[in-house]
Design a protein with these regions (language model features):
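Rossmann-like flavin
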Residues: 1-68
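Helical element adjacent to the flavin cofactor pocket in flavoenzyme catalytic cores
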Residues: 75-137, 144
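A conserved FAD-binding loop/helix module that cradles the flavin
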Residues: 347-370
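Active-site-proximal substrate-binding core of FAD-dependent oxidoreductases
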Residues: 121, 370-394
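Mid-domain catalytic core of redox enzymes
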Residues: 117-240, 386
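Active-site-adjacent "gating/activation" loops or surface patches in catalytic cores
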Residues: 53-86, 336-340
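A glycine-rich dinucleotide-binding beta-alpha-beta segment and adjacent secondary-structure elements
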Residues: 48-62, 221-229, 283-351
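C-terminal segments that line or cap access tunnels to active or ligand-binding sites in enzymes
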Residues: 189-305
Length: 394
Protein backbone atom coordinates (compact mmCIF):
# COMPACT_ATOMS: atom_id res chain seq x y z
CA UNK A 1 0.00 0.00 0.00
CA UNK A 2 2.86 2.41 0.78
CA UNK A 3 4.48 1.71 -2.60
CA UNK A 4 1.19 2.50 -4.34
CA UNK A 5 0.67 5.58 -2.18
CA UNK A 6 4.11 7.14 -2.49
CA UNK A 7 6.03 5.72 -5.46
CA UNK A 8 3.64 4.75 -8.27
CA UNK A 9 2.00 8.10 -9.00
CA UNK A 10 4.96 10.45 -8.66
CA UNK A 11 7.39 11.95 -11.17
CA UNK A 12 10.04 12.18 -8.41
CA UNK A 13 10.32 15.89 -9.25
CA UNK A 14 10.29 16.56 -5.51
CA UNK A 15 11.54 13.63 -3.45
CA UNK A 16 10.33 15.30 -0.26
CA UNK A 17 6.76 14.27 -1.08
CA UNK A 18 7.82 10.62 -0.81
CA UNK A 19 10.08 11.10 2.20
CA UNK A 20 7.23 11.20 4.71
CA UNK A 21 7.37 10.04 8.32
CA UNK A 22 5.34 7.01 7.27
CA UNK A 23 7.91 6.10 4.61
CA UNK A 24 10.98 6.93 6.70
CA UNK A 25 9.69 4.74 9.52
CA UNK A 26 9.86 1.80 7.12
CA UNK A 27 12.94 2.93 5.17
CA UNK A 28 14.86 -0.26 5.91
CA UNK A 29 12.05 -2.38 4.46
CA UNK A 30 11.78 -0.14 1.39
CA UNK A 31 15.50 -0.43 0.74
CA UNK A 32 15.27 -4.20 1.08
CA UNK A 33 12.33 -4.30 -1.34
CA UNK A 34 14.41 -2.35 -3.86
CA UNK A 35 17.60 -4.40 -3.66
CA UNK A 36 16.17 -7.88 -3.04
CA UNK A 37 14.82 -9.75 -6.09
CA UNK A 38 11.20 -10.81 -6.13
CA UNK A 39 12.17 -14.49 -6.21
CA UNK A 40 13.74 -14.29 -2.73
CA UNK A 41 10.74 -12.55 -1.19
CA UNK A 42 8.40 -15.14 -2.70
CA UNK A 43 10.62 -18.02 -1.53
CA UNK A 44 10.49 -16.71 2.04
CA UNK A 45 6.73 -16.23 1.90
CA UNK A 46 5.47 -19.52 0.42
CA UNK A 47 6.91 -23.02 0.10
CA UNK A 48 4.72 -24.56 -2.59
CA UNK A 49 6.53 -24.44 -5.93
CA UNK A 50 3.32 -23.70 -7.83
CA UNK A 51 2.51 -20.72 -5.63
CA UNK A 52 6.06 -19.44 -5.98
CA UNK A 53 5.66 -19.45 -9.74
CA UNK A 54 2.24 -17.79 -9.62
CA UNK A 55 3.59 -15.02 -7.39
CA UNK A 56 6.78 -14.64 -9.42
CA UNK A 57 5.25 -14.63 -12.90
CA UNK A 58 4.00 -11.00 -12.76
CA UNK A 59 7.66 -10.07 -13.28
CA UNK A 60 7.19 -11.13 -16.91
CA UNK A 61 4.53 -8.46 -17.35
CA UNK A 62 7.05 -6.00 -15.93
CA UNK A 63 9.47 -6.93 -18.68
CA UNK A 64 11.81 -8.85 -16.43
CA UNK A 65 12.51 -12.03 -14.49
CA UNK A 66 11.58 -12.70 -10.85
CA UNK A 67 15.31 -13.21 -10.34
CA UNK A 68 16.02 -9.63 -11.49
CA UNK A 69 12.89 -7.64 -10.61
CA UNK A 70 12.98 -5.75 -7.29
CA UNK A 71 10.63 -7.33 -4.77
CA UNK A 72 8.86 -3.97 -4.43
CA UNK A 73 6.85 -5.10 -7.43
CA UNK A 74 5.11 -7.80 -5.42
CA UNK A 75 2.48 -5.06 -5.31
CA UNK A 76 1.31 -6.41 -8.71
CA UNK A 77 0.27 -9.68 -7.04
CA UNK A 78 -1.18 -7.69 -4.16
CA UNK A 79 -3.45 -5.83 -6.58
CA UNK A 80 -4.50 -9.09 -8.27
CA UNK A 81 -5.24 -10.92 -5.04
CA UNK A 82 -6.80 -8.03 -3.13
CA UNK A 83 -8.70 -6.16 -5.85
CA UNK A 84 -9.34 -9.07 -8.19
CA UNK A 85 -8.69 -9.43 -11.92
CA UNK A 86 -11.02 -7.33 -14.06
CA UNK A 87 -11.93 -7.76 -17.72
CA UNK A 88 -13.37 -5.07 -20.05
CA UNK A 89 -16.30 -6.53 -21.98
CA UNK A 90 -15.47 -6.26 -25.66
CA UNK A 91 -11.77 -6.77 -24.97
CA UNK A 92 -8.98 -4.29 -24.35
CA UNK A 93 -9.93 -2.57 -27.58
CA UNK A 94 -12.85 -1.14 -25.62
CA UNK A 95 -10.43 0.52 -23.18
CA UNK A 96 -8.68 2.31 -26.03
CA UNK A 97 -11.97 3.18 -27.72
CA UNK A 98 -13.27 4.62 -24.45
CA UNK A 99 -10.18 6.79 -24.04
CA UNK A 100 -10.57 8.01 -27.62
CA UNK A 101 -14.26 8.77 -27.04
CA UNK A 102 -13.49 10.79 -23.92
CA UNK A 103 -10.71 12.66 -25.72
CA UNK A 104 -12.89 13.54 -28.71
CA UNK A 105 -15.70 14.68 -26.42
CA UNK A 106 -13.17 17.03 -24.83
CA UNK A 107 -12.31 18.44 -28.27
CA UNK A 108 -9.18 16.45 -29.08
CA UNK A 109 -8.34 16.00 -32.78
CA UNK A 110 -6.98 12.45 -33.17
CA UNK A 111 -5.12 11.82 -36.43
CA UNK A 112 -4.43 8.16 -37.17
CA UNK A 113 -2.47 6.56 -40.05
CA UNK A 114 0.06 9.35 -39.58
CA UNK A 115 3.76 8.84 -38.87
CA UNK A 116 5.64 11.47 -36.88
CA UNK A 117 9.06 11.97 -38.44
CA UNK A 118 10.52 14.85 -36.44
CA UNK A 119 10.01 16.91 -33.32
CA UNK A 120 10.41 20.54 -34.36
CA UNK A 121 12.54 22.68 -32.06
CA UNK A 122 13.61 26.31 -32.06
CA UNK A 123 16.40 27.44 -29.74
CA UNK A 124 15.92 24.47 -27.43
CA UNK A 125 12.13 24.76 -27.33
CA UNK A 126 9.71 22.16 -28.74
CA UNK A 127 7.37 23.98 -31.14
CA UNK A 128 5.57 21.09 -32.86
CA UNK A 129 5.99 17.95 -34.93
CA UNK A 130 6.35 17.00 -38.56
CA UNK A 131 4.34 14.00 -39.74
CA UNK A 132 3.40 12.13 -42.90
CA UNK A 133 -0.20 11.10 -43.50
CA UNK A 134 -1.48 7.91 -45.13
CA UNK A 135 -1.22 9.49 -48.59
CA UNK A 136 2.45 10.33 -48.04
CA UNK A 137 1.87 14.07 -47.66
CA UNK A 138 4.06 15.87 -45.12
CA UNK A 139 2.56 18.21 -42.54
CA UNK A 140 3.82 20.42 -39.73
CA UNK A 141 1.71 20.73 -36.60
CA UNK A 142 2.57 23.55 -34.20
CA UNK A 143 2.26 23.03 -30.46
CA UNK A 144 3.04 24.68 -27.14
CA UNK A 145 3.81 21.30 -25.60
CA UNK A 146 4.88 18.03 -27.23
CA UNK A 147 4.22 14.70 -25.52
CA UNK A 148 5.62 11.52 -27.04
CA UNK A 149 3.94 8.22 -26.20
CA UNK A 150 6.20 6.41 -28.68
CA UNK A 151 9.10 4.16 -27.71
CA UNK A 152 11.57 6.44 -25.93
CA UNK A 153 14.60 5.14 -27.82
CA UNK A 154 12.83 5.82 -31.12
CA UNK A 155 11.71 9.28 -30.00
CA UNK A 156 15.14 10.35 -28.81
CA UNK A 157 17.41 8.84 -31.45
CA UNK A 158 15.32 9.41 -34.59
CA UNK A 159 13.17 12.51 -33.96
CA UNK A 160 15.76 14.78 -32.33
CA UNK A 161 19.18 16.09 -33.25
CA UNK A 162 22.07 14.54 -31.28
CA UNK A 163 22.55 17.72 -29.26
CA UNK A 164 18.89 17.59 -28.22
CA UNK A 165 18.87 14.00 -26.97
CA UNK A 166 18.52 13.39 -23.24
CA UNK A 167 18.81 9.64 -23.85
CA UNK A 168 21.23 9.21 -26.79
CA UNK A 169 22.40 5.93 -28.32
CA UNK A 170 25.14 5.40 -25.72
CA UNK A 171 22.55 5.58 -22.93
CA UNK A 172 20.74 2.56 -24.38
CA UNK A 173 23.93 0.51 -24.74
CA UNK A 174 23.96 0.12 -20.96
CA UNK A 175 20.27 -0.72 -20.59
CA UNK A 176 18.48 -4.07 -20.36
CA UNK A 177 15.44 -4.54 -22.62
CA UNK A 178 12.39 -6.39 -21.42
CA UNK A 179 11.63 -9.58 -23.31
CA UNK A 180 9.96 -9.67 -26.65
CA UNK A 181 7.15 -12.11 -27.26
CA UNK A 182 5.73 -14.63 -29.64
CA UNK A 183 2.02 -13.85 -29.73
CA UNK A 184 -0.62 -16.18 -31.13
CA UNK A 185 -4.13 -14.99 -31.94
CA UNK A 186 -6.23 -18.09 -32.57
CA UNK A 187 -9.81 -18.74 -33.57
CA UNK A 188 -10.70 -22.29 -32.55
CA UNK A 189 -13.78 -24.27 -33.57
CA UNK A 190 -15.76 -25.73 -30.70
CA UNK A 191 -15.52 -25.16 -26.98
CA UNK A 192 -12.33 -25.44 -24.93
CA UNK A 193 -13.39 -26.31 -21.37
CA UNK A 194 -9.80 -27.39 -20.68
CA UNK A 195 -8.77 -23.70 -20.64
CA UNK A 196 -9.79 -21.09 -18.09
CA UNK A 197 -10.18 -17.41 -18.89
CA UNK A 198 -6.55 -17.11 -17.73
CA UNK A 199 -4.29 -20.17 -17.91
CA UNK A 200 -0.60 -20.29 -16.99
CA UNK A 201 1.59 -23.19 -18.10
CA UNK A 202 4.95 -23.22 -16.31
CA UNK A 203 8.17 -25.04 -17.17
CA UNK A 204 9.30 -27.40 -14.42
CA UNK A 205 12.70 -25.68 -14.32
CA UNK A 206 11.48 -22.22 -15.04
CA UNK A 207 14.64 -20.51 -13.76
CA UNK A 208 16.37 -22.12 -16.72
CA UNK A 209 13.76 -20.53 -18.97
CA UNK A 210 14.41 -17.06 -17.58
CA UNK A 211 18.16 -17.57 -17.90
CA UNK A 212 17.64 -18.48 -21.56
CA UNK A 213 15.79 -15.22 -22.20
CA UNK A 214 17.92 -12.86 -20.09
CA UNK A 215 21.32 -14.59 -20.22
CA UNK A 216 24.47 -13.34 -21.95
CA UNK A 217 23.57 -15.36 -25.05
CA UNK A 218 19.76 -15.18 -25.17
CA UNK A 219 17.89 -18.10 -26.70
CA UNK A 220 14.26 -19.11 -27.08
CA UNK A 221 13.36 -21.54 -24.26
CA UNK A 222 11.84 -24.83 -25.42
CA UNK A 223 9.45 -25.70 -23.95
CA UNK A 224 8.50 -22.27 -22.68
CA UNK A 225 6.27 -21.01 -19.90
CA UNK A 226 3.04 -19.73 -21.48
CA UNK A 227 0.21 -17.37 -20.69
CA UNK A 228 -3.11 -18.24 -22.36
CA UNK A 229 -6.24 -16.10 -22.37
CA UNK A 230 -9.68 -17.37 -23.45
CA UNK A 231 -11.94 -14.29 -23.22
CA UNK A 232 -14.73 -15.94 -25.23
CA UNK A 233 -15.59 -17.95 -22.13
CA UNK A 234 -17.16 -14.84 -20.60
CA UNK A 235 -17.49 -12.38 -23.49
CA UNK A 236 -19.78 -13.11 -26.48
CA UNK A 237 -18.36 -10.06 -28.28
CA UNK A 238 -15.02 -11.65 -29.12
CA UNK A 239 -15.96 -14.81 -31.06
CA UNK A 240 -18.92 -16.10 -33.09
CA UNK A 241 -21.11 -18.77 -31.56
CA UNK A 242 -19.49 -22.19 -31.62
CA UNK A 243 -15.93 -20.81 -31.59
CA UNK A 244 -13.35 -19.77 -29.02
CA UNK A 245 -11.01 -16.78 -29.06
CA UNK A 246 -7.58 -17.77 -27.73
CA UNK A 247 -4.59 -15.50 -27.14
CA UNK A 248 -1.18 -16.93 -26.25
CA UNK A 249 1.87 -15.03 -24.98
CA UNK A 250 5.30 -16.66 -25.04
CA UNK A 251 8.17 -14.59 -23.58
CA UNK A 252 11.24 -14.77 -25.85
CA UNK A 253 14.43 -12.69 -26.20
CA UNK A 254 14.25 -9.13 -27.50
CA UNK A 255 15.83 -9.84 -30.88
CA UNK A 256 14.19 -8.75 -34.17
CA UNK A 257 16.28 -11.29 -36.09
CA UNK A 258 14.09 -14.06 -34.62
CA UNK A 259 11.52 -12.90 -37.14
CA UNK A 260 8.06 -11.50 -37.72
CA UNK A 261 4.68 -13.18 -37.73
CA UNK A 262 1.76 -12.94 -40.15
CA UNK A 263 -1.71 -14.27 -40.83
CA UNK A 264 -2.42 -17.95 -41.55
CA UNK A 265 1.16 -19.18 -41.23
CA UNK A 266 2.72 -16.70 -43.65
CA UNK A 267 5.19 -15.29 -41.13
CA UNK A 268 8.92 -15.91 -41.05
CA UNK A 269 9.68 -19.65 -40.91
CA UNK A 270 11.25 -19.60 -37.45
CA UNK A 271 8.28 -17.77 -35.94
CA UNK A 272 5.78 -20.16 -37.52
CA UNK A 273 7.77 -23.20 -36.38
CA UNK A 274 7.80 -21.83 -32.84
CA UNK A 275 4.05 -21.21 -33.06
CA UNK A 276 3.48 -24.81 -34.18
CA UNK A 277 5.46 -26.06 -31.18
CA UNK A 278 3.49 -23.83 -28.81
CA UNK A 279 0.16 -25.12 -30.14
CA UNK A 280 1.44 -28.69 -29.75
CA UNK A 281 2.60 -27.89 -26.20
CA UNK A 282 -0.82 -26.51 -25.24
CA UNK A 283 -2.46 -29.54 -26.83
CA UNK A 284 -0.26 -31.93 -24.85
CA UNK A 285 -0.19 -30.11 -21.51
CA UNK A 286 -3.93 -29.35 -21.34
CA UNK A 287 -5.33 -32.47 -22.97
CA UNK A 288 -6.71 -31.05 -26.22
CA UNK A 289 -5.36 -33.60 -28.74
CA UNK A 290 -7.08 -32.10 -31.79
CA UNK A 291 -6.30 -28.44 -31.04
CA UNK A 292 -4.16 -27.85 -34.15
CA UNK A 293 -6.85 -29.27 -36.44
CA UNK A 294 -9.51 -27.03 -34.88
CA UNK A 295 -7.63 -23.75 -35.44
CA UNK A 296 -9.54 -21.83 -38.12
CA UNK A 297 -7.93 -18.41 -37.69
CA UNK A 298 -4.27 -17.89 -36.90
CA UNK A 299 -2.14 -14.80 -36.61
CA UNK A 300 1.37 -14.67 -35.19
CA UNK A 301 3.45 -11.72 -33.98
CA UNK A 302 7.19 -11.80 -33.31
CA UNK A 303 10.02 -9.46 -32.29
CA UNK A 304 10.35 -8.21 -35.86
CA UNK A 305 6.77 -6.95 -35.76
CA UNK A 306 7.43 -5.00 -32.58
CA UNK A 307 10.55 -3.43 -34.10
CA UNK A 308 9.12 -2.67 -37.56
CA UNK A 309 5.53 -1.76 -36.73
CA UNK A 310 5.91 -0.15 -33.30
CA UNK A 311 9.53 1.08 -33.48
CA UNK A 312 10.19 -0.86 -30.28
CA UNK A 313 13.78 -0.76 -29.07
CA UNK A 314 15.42 -4.10 -29.92
CA UNK A 315 12.00 -5.55 -30.63
CA UNK A 316 10.98 -5.64 -26.98
CA UNK A 317 7.29 -6.20 -26.42
CA UNK A 318 7.24 -4.11 -23.25
CA UNK A 319 10.09 -1.64 -22.78
CA UNK A 320 13.20 -1.45 -20.59
CA UNK A 321 13.14 -4.26 -18.02
CA UNK A 322 12.30 -3.50 -14.40
CA UNK A 323 15.72 -4.22 -12.96
CA UNK A 324 16.93 -2.25 -9.93
CA UNK A 325 18.80 0.28 -12.08
CA UNK A 326 15.74 0.76 -14.30
CA UNK A 327 13.02 1.11 -11.67
CA UNK A 328 11.42 3.95 -9.70
CA UNK A 329 13.61 7.09 -9.68
CA UNK A 330 16.35 5.22 -11.59
CA UNK A 331 14.07 4.87 -14.62
CA UNK A 332 14.05 7.39 -17.47
CA UNK A 333 12.15 10.52 -16.46
CA UNK A 334 9.12 11.96 -18.22
CA UNK A 335 10.64 15.30 -19.21
CA UNK A 336 13.43 16.13 -21.64
CA UNK A 337 16.51 17.69 -20.06
CA UNK A 338 17.59 19.19 -23.38
CA UNK A 339 14.36 20.43 -25.01
CA UNK A 340 11.94 22.62 -23.10
CA UNK A 341 8.30 21.66 -23.57
CA UNK A 342 9.04 18.02 -24.53
CA UNK A 343 7.63 15.26 -22.34
CA UNK A 344 7.29 11.47 -22.39
CA UNK A 345 4.68 8.87 -21.41
CA UNK A 346 4.41 5.12 -21.89
CA UNK A 347 6.27 2.01 -20.84
CA UNK A 348 9.75 3.44 -21.43
CA UNK A 349 9.41 6.06 -18.71
CA UNK A 350 8.09 6.25 -15.14
CA UNK A 351 6.40 4.42 -13.54
CA UNK A 352 7.07 1.63 -16.02
CA UNK A 353 5.80 -1.33 -18.00
CA UNK A 354 2.30 -2.68 -18.39
CA UNK A 355 -1.01 -1.17 -19.48
CA UNK A 356 -1.98 0.07 -15.98
CA UNK A 357 1.38 1.78 -15.50
CA UNK A 358 1.32 3.24 -19.02
CA UNK A 359 -2.03 4.84 -18.17
CA UNK A 360 -0.61 5.99 -14.84
CA UNK A 361 2.32 7.58 -16.74
CA UNK A 362 -0.18 9.92 -18.40
CA UNK A 363 -1.62 10.79 -15.00
CA UNK A 364 1.86 11.44 -13.63
CA UNK A 365 2.57 13.78 -16.53
CA UNK A 366 -0.71 15.66 -16.02
CA UNK A 367 0.38 16.25 -12.43
CA UNK A 368 3.79 17.46 -13.59
CA UNK A 369 2.29 19.89 -16.10
CA UNK A 370 0.04 21.25 -13.35
CA UNK A 371 2.99 21.69 -11.00
CA UNK A 372 1.54 19.03 -8.69
CA UNK A 373 4.41 17.26 -6.90
CA UNK A 374 2.22 15.17 -4.61
CA UNK A 375 2.93 11.44 -4.49
CA UNK A 376 -0.60 10.06 -4.68
CA UNK A 377 -3.05 9.58 -7.55
CA UNK A 378 -5.53 12.16 -8.78
CA UNK A 379 -9.13 11.91 -7.65
CA UNK A 380 -11.22 9.59 -9.83
CA UNK A 381 -14.73 10.43 -11.05
CA UNK A 382 -15.65 6.71 -11.10
CA UNK A 383 -18.51 7.21 -13.54
CA UNK A 384 -20.08 3.82 -14.42
CA UNK A 385 -19.98 2.77 -18.07
CA UNK A 386 -22.50 0.29 -19.50
CA UNK A 387 -21.11 -2.91 -21.02
CA UNK A 388 -21.40 -3.15 -24.83
CA UNK A 389 -24.07 -5.40 -26.32
CA UNK A 390 -22.98 -8.51 -28.27
CA UNK A 391 -22.24 -7.83 -31.93
CA UNK A 392 -23.79 -9.94 -34.69
CA UNK A 393 -21.24 -12.16 -36.44
CA UNK A 394 -21.35 -12.90 -40.18
Amino acid sequence: ELAKKYFLYTSFADLRTSATKEVLAKAARFIRLLIEPLSKLVARTVKDDRLRKVLGYPAVFLGSSPYLTPSMYHLMSHLDLSDGVLYPMGGFTRVIESIADIARTAGVDIRTDSKVTRIVTVDGLATGVEYTDAAGTSHTLTADTVVSAADLHHTETTMLEPSEQTYPAEYWQKKVPGPSALLLYLGVKGELPELEHHTLLFMKDWQEGFEAIFGHEPTVPEPASLYICKPSGVDPNVAPEGYENVFVLVPIPADPSIGSGEIDGDGDPRIERLADKVIAQISDWTGIPDLAERVTVRRTVGPGNFADELNAWRGTALGPAHTLKQSAFFRAGNVSKKVKGLYYVGGSTIPGIGLPMCLISAEVLVKRLRGDTSAGPLAEPLTPVAAPQPRPWP
